[in-house]
Each structure stands twice: as C-alpha cells, then as structure tokens.
C-alpha cells in the first residue's frame, strides 16, 4: 500500500526543523511560502507555517480593525508571544507608506512576520486597519499600518491621521516605505503623510511650556527604506533630497510661539536604507534585507535603530492598556496628552500589581496570624514580617517601577501603608502575648526566688523586673518594623504596672507570712513564761508576765523591721503590719491568760498552793500529824494564804501601771479565724468576774475542808495504835502454828516459794507495777464499798446530802478524803 500521502500529511502537520527554517528564511519566494501555507491549512490552521513556537497558534493580531475598533485580545497575545513579562526589554516598530508598495512583504522579510501580502494579479488593498505581529529574531512588536492614498478610502484622510497619531505615540521607529522613483514627489513620496506625522508630534510634545528641548523619550526615529534602488542615483543624493524635504515640511508647519525656533532634529532622527528590486534582483534584495535586519538585532552596530532615547518607557505588561487608551482618545478626537496617558497606565498597572502583591502578602502572613491570636509568642516574627515586606515591595518594585515615576512612588507608599496596616495587628498581638508571658514568668521568678535560703525579697523583685523588661524590650524591638510609627512604650508601661501589682501582691503575701512566723515565735516565747508565772502566783506575778510580754513584742518588732527593709514596704504598710502583730500578740496573751484562769486551772493552782503550805513544812518535808500538833492553826493559815492569792487572778494588775500594754483599737479582730468577735477594750484587763471569784472560793473551801478532815483522821489513827503486849500474845499463841509451818514440808515449801518470789520481784523492780495493780483493785473495792454504804445509809438526811454531791475530776485523793469525811461524820453520830 502506498503510504506517501500519509507521510506528506504528517510532515505538513508537524513540519521538521529544516522545513521551518526554510519557511522562515527571507530568501524563500512568497509564492513557495504561500503554497506551503495553503497545504498546511487543513492541518494546522491558516497563517501558522514558518512561525516561532511561541506564536504558532496566533502569529498576528489585528489590533485596530477597519471599523476603527481596538481589540481586547492584545494582552493574551502578548503572553502567547512570550513578551508580556519582558518589562522594557522589547521594542515597537511601525511601517508607513502608500498602499500596495510592499510594506507587508518588507516586514515579513525583515522580521519574519506573517502579515498578509498583496495578490499581485489583483493590485488591491491587503492590510486593513492596524496589525501586529512579533519578530522572529528579537523581542520586537511589528505594526503593519494600513496604506495611504488607497482608492478604498479615497479622499478620507481621517484614518491616516489617527493611525499616524497612534503609531507616533506607541512606536520607537517609523519605517517609511517608498520607491526610488517617488523621491522628489510630494504625494508619491508620502510628504503629506510625513507632514501629518510632524504636526501630530508637535501636538503631542510641543504644546504648552517653555522648554524647546524635548525629553529623550519624546524622540522618534524615521527610517526611510528606499525600494527598487538600482544605483543610478547615488544614495547620498537621495538622502540629501529626503532630508531637505523633511526640513522644508518642518519649517512650513505652524508652530506655537515658544517653538518657533525648534528644529527637526530635536524631535526626530532620520535614517536611510536602500533595497534592490525584489523581482529583478532577488538575491541582492535578500542580501540587503539581511543587512538591514542586522540594524534591528545587532546592538553592537553604530547604526542600531532601537536606541534607548526612542523607547516610550511603557512596560510590556502595560502595552495593551496604554495602546487602548491612546486609541480611544485618538478616536474621540480629544487632545492626546501622552504624560496623562502614561500616568493613567501607571495607576492602572500599579493598582493591579499592588493587588496581586498584597494578596500574596496576606497569604504569607496567614500562617502566623492564628498563633498570635491564640496568645502564643511567635519566635522571629519581626524577621518574618520584614521578609514579607521585602518580598512584597521587591515584587512591586520589579513590576511597577517601569511605569510613571511619580505614580509608582505614590502607589508604593500606598502599598507600604496597607502592608503596615495589615501587620499592625500582628505587632500589637505579639506585644500583648509578650506582656502576658512576661508577667507569668515574673510571678514564677518571685515564687522561685523566695524559696532560696537567705533571699532578699527586694533583690528578687528588682532582678525579676529587670529580666522581664529586657525580654519584653528584646521581643518588642525584634517585632518592630522600620519606617513605621509603631510604638511599644504604651505596652511597656502597662507591663510595668502589672509587674508592680504582682510585686505588691507578693510583698503583701510574704509580709503576711513573715508576720505569721513572727507571731508564732511570739506565742512560743510568751506562753511558757506566762504558764510558769501563773502556776506560782505571787503579788509580782503580773509584773513578770507583762515584762516578758513587752520584751517579746519589742524583739518581734525589731525582727519585723529588720526583714521589712528587703521588702521595700512603705511606712504605712509597716505601721499596719506592726499594729496587726501587736494585736495578735495581745490576743494570744489574752487567750493564754483565759486558759490559765479557767475554773479547773485556778482550783488546781490553789489546791497545789494550799497543799504545799498545809501538808509540807518550810523545808518541803511532808508533815506527819501528831496529837500535840496544832492542826487547826496550820489549816487556817494555809487556807487564808491561799484565798489571798485568788484575787490576783481576777484582773491584770501590775504593781506599776506603765507595764500595761497599749491596747489595739476597738475594731474587728485581727485574728478572725481564731476569734471572729470584735475586740472590747473595756474588759481587756478583766479575767474573772466577782461571781466567778465567789464560786471558785466556795469550791476551794470544800476541797480545803476535805484535806483538813483527812489530816484529822490520820492523826486519830496514829493515836489509836495496837498495844505492845499484843505482839507478845501473838507470839505465844502463834508459836505452834509457826512451828507447824516450819516443820511441815508442804507449808515450808510454800513459804520458800513466796520468799523467792518476793526476792525476784524486788530484784527485777516489779514492786511498783504490782503495787499499782493492787492499788487499782483496792480502789475498785473501795468504790463498791462506798456504793454499798450509800445504799445502806440512804435514810440518813445528812449523809444523803453529802453523798449526793457530784464528784469532781480533780483527783482520786480528793474523792478519798470526801469519803473519809462522810464516814467520820457517820461514826461520830
């Protein structure tokens, strides 16, 4: 099967590199190029053969159609042509000339474009409106402008003027295409069109102002390409003729008063090139085209056409907006103000760039916004923000600095303000988080510091404040962005206030702990001496108690003031603390005194004092009462001396009034937990009321009487002792029994066992425990006897009255004495 057609179709659909180079070669005849394009049309679409990769789908674009409408597709096409991101690294060239003079063919040969060319057999208009196509050999936008002097428009020159104005405002180089034989003619050489160009140029750059020298970007190069040059007329003559014609046209223009002396070279540079006849001399034509192309591509050549002075300084990504604005003003016949158009373009593009940059900036900042809002301190946030700002401004500067400088600077300031406003909540949030964390760390530092042995609270607080401030300032300075009006002094002042509040609270707590510790020490130092003094009451008892109290309080105050220096307490705080300490110490003394003046304690003290006087002599030896002793006198003396001590417990009454302490104010108790009732200074020195004294006196007298009866009974029992002769009777009568025990083995063994047991008990020291057990048993037996006696003598009124009295818990000896007293009375009756 013959597959040649299929292979040919594949080659046309995906032409090899050699075919593409052949199609792009300017020396390839138009007829051959057109034939290949027609063959490729069914596979790759019209007009794509021989175009570079970036422009395969859309090699050219009609930016202004025959209805004078500007296209909306210029920006997408610039992107397809890989020119949208070139910045200023691109050039624009346009061609003028009469209709059907080979302008499109010239552009296709020079730049490798794909503009439609005229069908030579029909000689009719080919280019309608304004077309644009990228160069194959450089970053150049080529505009093919509809030819002038065409029969289709006739005498309507409106579009010629508009296209000239548009091209002059947009391009760097104007190529004027004319035949050699047209030089010297007015209409044939497009002198009318050139006059229009000059007039338009004056309208654009010469209106108003006193400056006769245009700015560099206001200059344009006019390149005359002389076609079908056969060499009969030297090129220098042709150049001179065209230059003279240009100057004559320039001089004939009606100029403003301030531009009367303006010369052509201030606004235009003239350049010339000649091409041989395309049909008669095709090889030389192609060589001349290649040479001319070098002037557009080789920057090292002296005659390089795209000089910086000609560039309109419009970034590539703003070309579409700029040209559309130019055309709209041209279309509405308004005065075209290029600087205004450039400013409008700059505003539009700067706003677009700013929006894109700001959105990217917000996306970057989003990653830390949530942690900051959650209360966390983000490490290195300042560096991150500065990096975001630098990146955003770098992108903006890269893309927007190409536009109008004043607009760019203004928009940059606006963007910077927006960026700063967006970062300000992060700055404030970071400061608040630093504030919160530093206050927490400060509290922990104080708690840890007061646990150290021998700590100085003032040093701990100052050191903690210093560290907290240093950490806060370091974090605040790190997060502060340059060129902002952000301040952290207010937050620092709030931090200082919070640190002071925390320090004051901790100082109050530590002061309270110190006062409590001193109070406990005061209690320990007061309570024991008070108890000792009141257990041995004398007339100077209160002097001893109050002197001890005064010394302890004075030492406690000195200890407090010594420690309070490190707390930086104020005089008012010291006064309050000392008042609290004195009040608590006084209340502690009062409670101890009330404890020592309770009924049981006072009775015990009186009984002990009475017994020491009644039962013991001056040498402290226990008394054994004999019949000749005056027991009544001793009893009365001991009783009276003891009762004389009872009033000492009634009031705090030192021998010197100066020993009485200063009472705390009559306010609620300082020790609410122990005594929630208010302090009453009117009863501060009263311990026992008169009623209480009478009750204690009565109870003591009963105890003393019981002691007297016991002493009396012991003296009677010592008088009624066993006679001596009774012992002789016992020996005589018990002799036989004793002999029986000694000579009876069983009884003798029992006696030996008892003797050995007694010896062992004495040697092991068990006599005391055995006697204690025996006394307990005897006490129980005695209680049973007393109970039986009560039952037996229940009918006797006096015995019933005495036995009905409650037994106090003073001691078992008191109960015994009362029982003996009852039995003695019963025996007397």
Curated annotation (Swiss-Prot):
Q: Which Pfam families match?
A: RHD3_GTPase, Sey1_3HB
PROSITE patterns (UniProt xref) = G_GB1_RHD3
Query: Recorded GO terms, molecular function?
Result: GTP binding; GTPase activity
> Which intervals carry biased composition (Basic and acidic residues)?
814-829
Localized where? Answer: Endoplasmic reticulum membrane
Chain ranges sitting on the Lumenal side read 743-745
What is the protein's membrane topology class?
Multi-pass membrane protein
Q: What is its EC number?
A: 3.6.5.-
Q: Which InterPro entries does UniProt cross-reference here?
A: G_GB1_RHD3_dom, P-loop_NTPase, RHD3/Sey1, Sey1/RHD3-like_3HB
Which superkingdom heads the taxonomic lineage of this protein's source? Eukaryota
* Keywords associated with the record: Coiled coil, Endoplasmic reticulum, GTP-binding, Hydrolase, Membrane, Nucleotide-binding, Transmembrane, Transmembrane helix
Give an example GO biological process: endoplasmic reticulum membrane fusion
Question: Which regions form coiled coils?
Answer: 487-525
The residue ranges of the GB1/RHD3-type G domain are: 87-310
Q: Which SUPFAM superfamilies match?
A: P-loop containing nucleoside triphosphate hydrolases
Chain ranges passing through the membrane: 722-742, 746-766
> Which residue spans belong to the Cytoplasmic compartment?
1-721, 767-829
Instruction: Report residues binding GTP.
Output: 97-104
In this chain, the stretch annotated as Disordered covers: 806-829
Check the record and name the CDD domains matching this protein.
GBP
Q: Which PANTHER family match?
A: PROTEIN SEY1 (PTHR45923:SF2)
UniProt function note: Cooperates with the reticulon proteins and tubule-shaping DP1 family proteins to generate and maintain the structure of the tubular endoplasmic reticulum network. Has GTPase activity, which is required for its function in ER organization.
Homology family: Belongs to the TRAFAC class dynamin-like GTPase superfamily. GB1/RHD3 GTPase family. RHD3 subfamily.
* Name assigned to this protein: Protein SEY1
Q: Which organism is it from?
A: Cryptococcus neoformans var. neoformans serotype D (strain JEC21 / ATCC MYA-565) (Filobasidiella neoformans)
**Primary gene name:** SEY1
């Amino acid at each position: 099967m013959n597959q040649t057609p299929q292979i040919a179709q594949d080659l046309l659909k995906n032409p090899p590199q050699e075919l593409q180079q052949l199609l792009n070669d300017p020396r390839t005849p138009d007829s051959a190029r057109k034939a290949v394009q027609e063959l490729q049309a069914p596979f790759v679409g019209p007009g794509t053969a021989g175009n570079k990769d970036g422009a395969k789908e859309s090699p050219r674009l009609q930016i202004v159609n025959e209805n004078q409408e500007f296209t909306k597709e210029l920006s997408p096409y610039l992107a397809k042509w890989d020119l949208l991101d070139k910045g200023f690294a691109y050039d624009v060239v346009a061609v003028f000339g009469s209709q059907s003079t080979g302008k499109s063919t010239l552009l296709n040969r020079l730049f490798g474009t794909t503009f439609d060319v005229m069908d030579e057999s029909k000689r009719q208009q080919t280019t309608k409106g304004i077309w644009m196509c990228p160069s194959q050999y450089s970053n150049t936008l080529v505009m093919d402008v509809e030819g002038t002097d065409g029969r289709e428009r006739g005498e309507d020159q409106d579009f010629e003027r508009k296209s000239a104005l548009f091209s002059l405002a947009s391009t760097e180089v104007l190529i004027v295409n004319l035949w050699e034989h047209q030089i010297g003619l007015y209409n044939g050489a497009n002198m009318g069109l050139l006059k229009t160009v000059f007039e338009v140029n004056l309208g654009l750059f010469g209106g108003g102002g006193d400056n006769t020298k245009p700015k560099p970007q206001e200059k344009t190069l006019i390149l005359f390409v002389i076609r079908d040059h056969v060499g009969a007329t030297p090129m220098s003559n042709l150049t001179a003729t065209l230059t003279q014609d240009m100057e004559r046209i320039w001089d004939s223009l009606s100029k403003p008063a301030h531009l009367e002396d303006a010369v052509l070279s201030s606004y235009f540079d003239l350049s010339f090139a000649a091409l041989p006849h395309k049909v008669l001399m095709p090889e030389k034509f192609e060589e001349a085209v290649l040479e001319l192309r070098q002037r557009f591509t080789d920057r090292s050549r002296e005659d390089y056409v795209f000089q910086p002075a000609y560039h309109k300084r419009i970034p590539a990504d703003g070309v579409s907006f700029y040209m559309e604005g130019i055309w709209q003003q041209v279309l509405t016949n308004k005065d075209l103000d290029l600087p205004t158009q450039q400013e409008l373009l700059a505003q539009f593009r700067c706003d677009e760039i700013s929006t894109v940059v700001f959105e990217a900036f917000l996306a970057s900042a989003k990653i830390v916004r949530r942690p900051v809002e959650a209360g966390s301190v983000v490490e290195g946030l300042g560096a991150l923000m500065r990096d975001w700002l630098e990146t955003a401004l770098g992108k903006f500067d890269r893309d927007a600095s190409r536009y109008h400088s004043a607009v760019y600077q203004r928009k940059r300031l606006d963007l910077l303000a927006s960026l700063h406003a967006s970062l300000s909540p992060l700055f404030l949030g970071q400061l608040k988080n630093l504030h919160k964390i530093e206050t927490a760390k400060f509290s922990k530092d104080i708690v840890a510091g007061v646990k150290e042995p021998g700590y100085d609270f003032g040093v701990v607080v100052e050191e903690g404040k210093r560290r907290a401030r240093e950490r806060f300032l370091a974090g605040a300075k790190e997060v502060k962005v340059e060129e902002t009006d952000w301040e952290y002094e207010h937050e620092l002042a709030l931090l200082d206030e919070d640190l002071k509040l925390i320090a004051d609270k901790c100082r109050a707590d530590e002061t309270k702990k110190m006062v409590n510790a001193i109070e406990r020490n005061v209690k320990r130092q007061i309570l024991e001496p008070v108890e000792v003094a009141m257990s041995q009451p004398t007339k100077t008892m209160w002097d001893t108690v109050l002197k001890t109290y005064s010394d302890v309080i004075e030492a406690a105050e000195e200890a407090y003031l010594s420690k309070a220096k490190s707390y930086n307490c104020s005089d008012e705080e010291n006064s309050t603390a000392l008042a609290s300490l004195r009040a608590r110490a006084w209340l502690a003394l009062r409670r101890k005194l009330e404890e020592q003046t309770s009924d049981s304690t006072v009775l015990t003290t009186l009984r002990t004092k009475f017994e020491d006087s009644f039962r013991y002599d001056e040498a402290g030896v226990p008394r054994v009462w004999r019949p000749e002793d005056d027991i009544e006198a001793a009893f009365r003396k001991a009783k009276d001396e003891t009762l004389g001590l009872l009033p000492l417990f009634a009031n705090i009454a030192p021998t010197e009034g100066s020993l009485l302490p200063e009472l705390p104010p009559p306010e609620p108790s300082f020790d609410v937990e122990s005594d929630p009732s208010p302090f009453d200074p009117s009863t501060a020195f009263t311990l026992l009321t008169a009623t209480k004294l009478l009750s204690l006196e009565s109870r003591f007298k009963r105890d003393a009487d019981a002691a007297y009866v016991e002493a009396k009974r012991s003296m009677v029992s010592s008088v009624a002792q066993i006679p001596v002769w009774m012992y002789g009777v016992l020996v005589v009568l018990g002799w036989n029994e004793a002999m029986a025990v000694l000579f009876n083995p069983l009884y003798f063994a029992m006696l030996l066992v008892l003797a050995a047991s007694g010896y062992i008990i004495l040697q092991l020291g068990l006599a005391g425990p055995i006697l204690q057990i025996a006394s307990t048993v005897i006490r129980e037996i005695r209680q049973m006897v007393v109970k039986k006696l009560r039952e037996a003598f229940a009918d006797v009124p006096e015995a019933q009255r005495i036995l009905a009295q409650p037994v106090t818990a003073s001691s078992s000896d008191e109960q015994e004495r009362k029982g003996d007293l009852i039995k003695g009375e019963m025996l007397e009756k």
